Amino acid sequence: RQGKDSIDNLVDIIDKENVNSILVFTDKGVRAVGLCNKVEEICKTVQYRIIDDLTAEPAVADVERVINEVGSIKYDLIIGVGGGSVMDASKLASIILGADYSLRDLLKDSSIAKKQIKTVMIPTTCGTGSEATCNAIVAIPEQESKQGIVNNCMIPDYVILDVNMIAKLPPKIIAATGVDALAHVVECFTSKKATMLSDTYAKEGACKIFHNIRKAYNNANDLEAKAEMMLGAFYGGVAITGSGTTAVHALSYPLGGKYHIAHGVSNAILFAHVMEFNKDGCKDRLAMLCDAVYPELAVKSIDEKADYIIKEIADIVKDTNIPTSLEEFGVKPDDLDFLVQAGSQQTRLLVNNCKELSLDDIRYIYKKVM
């Protein structure tokens, strides 16, 4: 369900699913600005509970704490209202509550997961795409990194894309989450696992994000651009489910896990550099993406089109004032050995990359953003 005031469709979902009890996941920031008010109002027709103390990019212990708090109480529906962290936690709860396995079991083998409770995702950013994906990310503090749990049963049952939820989103959040969404579509399109279906969604998402991210960032009142960004992010999530992200996301995980750099920002710092490294392995695909996004572009050669996309990525990061260096976050050259080792362990994503990355390659990319 998509469009202004589409949040009202939540009433129909509750009726259709014969819901008597609801568990709502959100965070204090979302509640503080009133984005959960309408959801709470609608939920008052049944029994409901709100969990609003989720941390950004939650660790295993954070998710376990929430699961333990809920205990054996049965709920008919889980609603996630927030950004990627909130939606990921909601999706994890939907497969763990009432199950005979734990989160740590899933970290070892996510294939055992089964959907226990239906879900509704209501994103309040325009970037993560978690509302459409079959995966959830948790931080592993002892490894100073992150891990994804992947199973198709985590694909949300319902999604509500209401532009009112991002109408007052700060520009810096639009920028970071928007570039994250852009990374999703570009990585999925250049992934080894790309399919015709993922290509369709990646190209459509790319068109929406490339053409609207600056508008949404620069003009707080441009709800049309923001709505297009939400839809582009959703398409990126669908593309991930059919294809998968690659080295940008793989190398960003240690940056979030150890230095707590926001996910979208860490992706943005790496994005153009990884694509430049990848170029000779995917320039045909980048050229195809360029044709889809900029059909009137005067450049003709495959190399020029690939270069144009990579430059546009770098320009968007610059134009939306996202940091471009890890130095701003206290990352030092002495940290390179850790980053190289931690990044190389993200094999779930690195196997999707169009080029194999050696330890020296990973070191080269990290050094570029120091």
Regions found by a protein language model. Name each.
Residues 1-77, 326-327:
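ATP/NTP phosphate-donor binding region
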Residues 127, 234-267, 347-349:
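Glycine-rich phosphate/pyrophosphate-binding beta-alpha loops
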